[in-house]
Amino acid sequence: EVLFPFARQALPDFLGRHGKRPEVAALLEAVEEAWRNDPHPGAQALRQQAPGNEAGSGAERLVPYLQWLIDHDIKLTPLKDLQGRIWADGYGNGTITAPLFGDVAAALRRWNGEGLVLAVYSSGSVPAQQLLYRHSEDGDLSGLFSHWFDTRVGAKQHPKSYTEIAAAMGAEPQRVLFISDALGELEAAHGAGMAVLLSDRPGNPNRDSGPFERISDYSQLHPGHGHQ
């Protein structure tokens, strides 16, 4: 893992430098509101310890909550936007490049060359997705993708999100293959009619594939994979 630890560590410096910019300040207001309404005892305990108790008392007071969200893998949309901005900083100054498994770049280029339409659906913001593939260790891969989706299209555990994605791609869901490392996402995509595969990679937190086929090397993948 490179990107998430980098964003976590860089949060204080980034907010110190950019916290008053209007677009960042708007994101921080959304984070403040989410924190205020977060029912989790851990979040509220942090809030009690935070310096000041009102929005506008300083961007730095939000750092513990933002880091807590990262540590608990809570995909708050304004946090994802902030992470994307932090990664853009890191990519821009050469501090980071995006790591990919060794088989991924060749597979993406092969699929694109075969005329397959490629899309990304991630909890990370669309700009963050595009930055990742633009600054991969294997070069700029962003041009291989035709469509980009984040949680603004809907939650990844809801079948309706996948119906919307298929419509945006101009395809019937049955013509779409969705690959994920999360069983709940596979179930939702399958519920929308898509073919699905579990990406089984080292370090995946949950490798339960349920009734679905696994794949651990994209060089093994062919267009009919996952279709029943």
Where would I find each of the regions flagged by the language model?
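Metal-dependent phosphoesterase signature
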Residues: P39-G102
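Short secondary-structure boundary/capping segments
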Residues: E1-F4, H135-E137, M194
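Substrate-recognition element of Asp-dependent hydrolases with the DxDx(T/V) motif
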Residues: G84, N93-P99, V104-S136
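Short, well-ordered alpha-helical scaffold segments within catalytic/effector domains
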Residues: K80, F101-A105, P159-T163
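Short, solvent-exposed loop/turn segments at secondary-structure junctions
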Residues: W87-A88, S125-P127, L183-G184, G203-N204
